[in-house]
A protein has these predicted regions:
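Short amphipathic secondary-structure patches
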Residues: 2-44, 82-93, 97-159, 237, ...
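N-terminal positive-inside, membrane-proximal cytosolic segments immediately preceding the first
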Residues: 45-57
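N-terminal signal-anchor/signal peptide hydrophobic helix marking the start
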Residues: 57-69
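C-terminal juxtamembrane segment of a hydrophobic transmembrane alpha-helix
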Residues: 68-85
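Short, ordered "entry" segments at domain starts
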Residues: 158-310, 317-318, 322, 326-519, ...
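Short, low-complexity, Pro/Ser/Thr/Gly-rich segments in the mature regions of secreted, periplasmic
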Residues: 323, 680-697
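Acidic, Ser/Thr/Gly/Pro-rich low-complexity segments that form flexible
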Residues: 438, 475, 488, 516, ...
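Extended C-terminal subregions enriched in glycine
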Residues: 574-635, 643
Length: 697
């Protein structure tokens, strides 16, 4: 057991004296004590370092201190650039308004100066300095063929905080807008159907449209030897197939024309006039027609042939009229002057034979009504003249030299008389029975109203003139055949205008102008309703107005007897064709419009109104695909749209079509083909489709 010794220390004392063993033990303990202290010190330091590395106290504050300048900088960017977006939106709004205002001004005045003034005024009104606005007239970004007013606005914002990040203190904010003026300049040659053949040339033909465009929604095929002259050409579904060895789709100066892939909309798809023309056929089909004329039976009056002057005189007195007895001869009379005092005269038939002249109440009242239960007829070599009045003639009128005053004429169908040894073939037309027939010269003054139950016919070499002035009216029914109007070779038929008052022109049947060397003049009328086909082989003058033909329209070989150089001509004329029927001959088979046999047609469309620039309008129903054919030397000069959206337009055999003297030809079809020496020309610049202004970008 070890005895603990108490060692006392004094400040000035030395170590106590101990033996050697104790001294060594004391030294060893002291050594280990010092060593342990060092180890504990090092372990404590490492522990504290580890603790410090794991300690998060105060980290957010430190990181915030480091990141705060960056956060403030980005916040400044967000605020100042966000404000810049607001300014940009405001600039865009102002540029839209200014562009639209400039476009309206230019559309009205065609002045770039006034365009700029209008745009800048709108910008100033909305707080944008004029120095920050640029206004120009340029091409639309949507369609290079359309003009547009371009307005660009560039303003500058000063950045306050963003420069902390080294960003420029100036922020430029831009906006721009385009407002188009009108529609694209329409193409002169347009093929609409994507699945059809497009625009196709062959056989050395040329299509000349140097001042406008050629467009196809399918192919453009122009092999070597053919030529297309245009400002540019476009195709869509198909391809452009020009000559491989030389440029044959060229501009007017001979340089290659731009050819691009672009869809072309139907320029007349929304045309109000086209829609009304299409609807007109429904009106025609639902229209009613007057009842056939019916009158009570009266006594016949016959001059010459088997009737003696005594018998004729008695018949005249029987109807309540008188004759001039001063030159009466019971054996023979070559002249009769008859007067009637009553307001109504009832007669059976009145016929004149031999070398006799008859004047029937030529100075009578216009209010006199003449009722004929039979017919009126004078033979070759005779002359028959009536005054004014109302004429109800149940059995038709046949005139060799027959004249009427003005009035109202309701005439029924000519009927052969067995007792007169008549045959159908002997009655003027030869192949059908009409109401009114001229086999020499038949003239009815005007203005007059005509209701012809069975149509009219002018025989070979004969003349018929109906009406005078502008307030005539025509309702013409169908003969015993298909025709309502028929003309023979070398004949002249003239119908005076029905363009004022209550004048109408309605035809229930075909118009057969098949007599070569003939000329028929149609009246000017707001509307010409023809419930049938128009087939012309001679000449025709088309009075101004709309011709709604519920069938087909064809012009064949024949020559003209009109004063115009063109066989068929018309000014301020629109022809609408339903295509419900088509010709059966091989040249025009299945076509709604056909021009052939070296004949020529010149048409000028109206320049104003609902039907402005509409010349020939084909079937509009997708179920009617009859197109147009110009072939065998047929020649057309047309101003306005020649429009067959659902049918092919084909040229062949030297057929030609081009502009009339005034206006522009616009050829629009499902497809368009030229072959066999044919030619198409449109040598003028078409106007834009409309003056409508639209914001396009």
């Amino acid at each position: 057991m070890t005895t603990n010794k108490k060692i006392q220390w004094r400040a000035d004392a030395t170590h106590p004296k101990i033996d050697d063993h104790d001294a060594r033990l004391h030294d060893e303990r002291a050594h280990f004590t010092m060593l342990g202290g060092r180890i504990r010190y090092h372990n404590s330091l490492l522990s504290r370092l580890r603790s410090l590395s794991r300690n998060r106290d105060g980290g957010i504050a430190i990181m915030a201190a480091f990141c705060l300048p960056i956060v403030i900088g980005f916040a400044a960017l967000a605020v100042e650039y966000g404000y810049g977006l607001l300014v940009r939106d405001e600039n865009q709004r102002v540029s839209d308004l200014a562009s639209y205002a400039g476009a309206l001004a230019y559309s009205t005045t065609k002045s770039e100066d006034k365009m700029k003034v209008a745009a800048l005024a709108v910008a100033k009104l909305n707080g944008v300095d004029g120095a920050d606005v640029k206004v120009s007239l340029t091409a639309s970004p949507k369609d290079a063929r359309v003009q547009a007013v371009h307005v660009a606005i560039t303003t500058t914002n000063t950045l306050v905080l963003a420069p902390v990040l080294g960003v420029s203190p100036k922020l430029e904010i831009g906006a721009q807008a385009y407002s188009s003026i009108g529609a694209a300049e329409n193409g002169c040659i347009v093929a609409l159907d994507k699945s059809a053949s497009g625009v196709t040339l062959s056989g050395g033909v040329q299509a000349n449209a140097g001042k406008c465009y050629v467009a196809s929604n399918s192919d453009i095929v122009a092999p070597c030897g053919t030529k297309i002259t245009a400002k540019s050409a476009t195709y869509y579904e198909g391809a452009s197939e020009p000559c491989q060895w030389s440029s044959n789709i060229v501009q007017a100066d001979g340089s290659p024309a731009p050819v691009t892939r672009q869809y072309t909309s139907d320029p007349l798809a929304e045309n109000k006039g086209v829609a009304t023309l299409h609807d007109r056929f429904d009106i025609i089909r639902k229209a009613s027609w007057p009842f056939a004329v019916k009158v009570g039976k009266g006594p016949d009056i016959e001059f010459g042939d088997k009737a003696t002057p005594v018998q004729t005189a008695a018949a005249i007195e029987a109807v309540g009229c008188r004759y001039d007895s001063s030159n009466f001869n019971q054996y023979w009379m070559s002249r009769w002057d008859i007067t009637c005092s009553g307001s109504e005269v009832n007669i059976g038939s009145l016929r004149v034979h031999g070398d006799i002249q008859v004047k029937f109440n030529v100075t009578g009242s216009k209010n006199t009504t003449y009722n004929f239960s039979g017919r009126i007829q004078n033979a070759q070599g005779t002359k028959l003249e009536f005054g004014d009045g109302t004429f109800n003639v149940a059995g038709g009128i046949i005139g060799a030299d027959l004249t009427f005053g003005s009035g109202i004429f309701h005439v029924g169908q000519i009927v052969p008389k067995a007792e007169w040894n008549e045959s159908k073939q002997a009655l003027c037309s030869g192949n059908a029975l009409y109401s009114l027939c001229s086999d020499g010269k038949l003239t009815i003054d005007g203005p007059s109203t005509f209701v012809l139950d069975a149509g009219l016919h002018t025989g070979d070499g004969a003349m018929m003139k109906l009406g005078a002035g502008t307030s005539n009216s025509y309702i013409i029914g169908k003969s015993s055949g298909d025709n309502a109007i028929g003309v023979g070779g070398g004949s002249v038929t003239a119908l005076a205008d029905a363009s004022s008052g209550k004048g109408v022109f309605r035809v229930d049947g075909d118009v057969d102008g098949g007599g070569g060397g003939s000329c028929i003049t149609f009246p000017a009328s707001a509307q010409h309703d023809i419930s049938g086909n128009v087939n012309l082989a001679g000449g025709a003058k088309l009075g101004a107005g709309v011709y709604a033909v519920d069938g087909y329209f064809s012009v064949h070989t024949g020559g003209a007897n009109c004063s115009d150089t063109a066989a068929v001509s018309g000014t301020n004329v629109t022809i609408a064709i339903s295509g419900t029927e088509t010709p059966s001959d091989w040249e025009c088979k299945d076509k709604a419009f056909c021009l052939t046999g070296g004949n020529a047609i010149t048409l000028t469309a109206p320049s104003s109104g609902d039907h402005a620039n509409l010349a020939v309008i084909g079937p509009q129903s997708s179920k009617r695909t009859a197109g147009a054919e110009i072939t065998s030397g047929g020649r057309g000069r047309i101003s306005g749209a020649f429009y067959f959206p659902n049918g092919a337009i084909d040229f062949g055999g030297g057929g030609q079509i081009g502009d009339a003297a005034t206006g522009c030809l616009q050829l629009i079809g499902a497809s368009i083909s030229l072959s066999g020496g044919s030619q198409m020309m449109s040598e003028c610049k078409l106007q834009t489709g409309s003056g409508k202004v639209a914001l396009v970008q």
